[in-house]
Amino acid sequence: MLVWLAEYLVRYETAFNAISYITVRANLALLTALFISLWIGPKVIKRLQILKFGQEVRNDGPESHFAKKGTPTMGGVMILFSIGVSTLLWANLANPYIWVCLFVLFGYGAIGFVDDFRKITRKNTDGLIARWKYFWMSVVALVAILWLYWLGHDTDATRLVIPFFKDIMPQLGLFYIVLSYFVIVGTGNAVNLTDGLDGLAIMPTALVAGAFALIAWATGNVNFAEYLHIPYIKYSSEVVVFCTAIVGASLGFLWFNTYPAQVFMGDVGSLALGGALGVVAILVRQEFLLVIMGGVFVVEALSVILQVGSYKLRKQRIFRMAPIHHHFELKGWPEPRVIIRFWIISLMLVLMGLVTLKLR
């Protein structure tokens, strides 16, 4: 939005030309989202307390979690608000990719909001019926994917980029829709499953979003895209602003979500952030890198799949409890140790993912 204002004001003062640079707007988007999150955080927490929007806890979970019951939840609304305002202020709103990102973010956020609200009103951990939850997640994902397919049909925007192989980039055609569906829905659920400890999901989210900001910048620059042997995607550079807004909002939320948490993001935050990371990975054609950099999310989701599958087939559990972060808690690891170690692993995976861009 401010890009358009700057284009007008530059006629009178050339300093406003700085806002046309993506790097300037990306940094301003990060700072804006961070400050908004820090500013509204206490107000949101107080309002959630007044409304008695408290966290419900599983009866079969670790005993240390019983003390978390009643902690304000649905704090993800402050994340979404911060990202939304910052993106609308600093992104070029003529770019269609920005609207796709915001559509998925708020679409999944709305689904998560309903899920959280039902848990609170019913005073248990049961939210939306699973089939309806997946139905609406699928609807949002497919609308976004078809939108993107229409924008980039038969261009580099629908090619598959495979790490380590610079000359293998097959045109996906209609399979682009199938792959993109699993990426968005899968990432949304994976981040949702990871959000079980104070700050566990939000830091990896910030790290992955920060890495995707760098990748989006390179993908949207003809020279860097050619140098790294990755597709040049016409509209992708503006996605940098959206990614840095996620980083800023995530760090601002972490201020209140760090152990012991003053607020939880709830499904309204985790589903939205997961869906956002998924759609960004599709936009910059780096679905495989999302698996690497978001390895913590992948392992958390796989632990649940393996646990459920093993119990149904063999009546035996692989882990003491799933997702896997609860397994380590039940082994005696203090919650902060689990969180920090998962953060370290996430940082390592993000750095590994960035390195693969050059190893081709």
Swiss-Prot record:
Topological type in the membrane: Multi-pass membrane protein
EC assignment: 2.7.8.13
GO terms assigned for molecular function: metal ion binding; phospho-N-acetylmuramoyl-pentapeptide-transferase activity; UDP-N-acetylmuramoyl-L-alanyl-D-glutamyl-meso-2,6-diaminopimelyl-D-alanyl-D-alanine:undecaprenyl-phosphate transferase activity
Membrane-spanning parts: 21-41, 73-93, 94-114, 132-152, 168-188, 199-219, 239-259, 263-283, 288-308, 338-358
PROSITE patterns registered for this protein in UniProt: MRAY_1 (PS01347), MRAY_2 (PS01348)
One cellular component term from this protein's GO annotations in UniProt: plasma membrane
Pathway(s) this gene product operates in, as recorded in its UniProt entry: Cell wall biogenesis; peptidoglycan biosynthesis
Cell compartment(s), UniProt: Cell inner membrane
This protein's UniProt keywords: Cell cycle, Cell division, Cell inner membrane, Cell membrane, Cell shape, Cell wall biogenesis/degradation, Magnesium, Membrane, Metal-binding, Peptidoglycan synthesis, Transferase, Transmembrane, Transmembrane helix
Swiss-Prot/TrEMBL cofactor(s): Mg(2+)
InterPro entries: Glycosyl_transferase_4, PNAcMuramoyl-5peptid_Trfase, PNAcMuramoyl-5peptid_Trfase_CS
Family: Belongs to the glycosyltransferase 4 family. MraY subfamily.
Function (record text): Catalyzes the initial step of the lipid cycle reactions in the biosynthesis of the cell wall peptidoglycan: transfers peptidoglycan precursor phospho-MurNAc-pentapeptide from UDP-MurNAc-pentapeptide onto the lipid carrier undecaprenyl phosphate, yielding undecaprenyl-pyrophosphoryl-MurNAc-pentapeptide, known as lipid I.
UniProt name for this protein: Phospho-N-acetylmuramoyl-pentapeptide-transferase
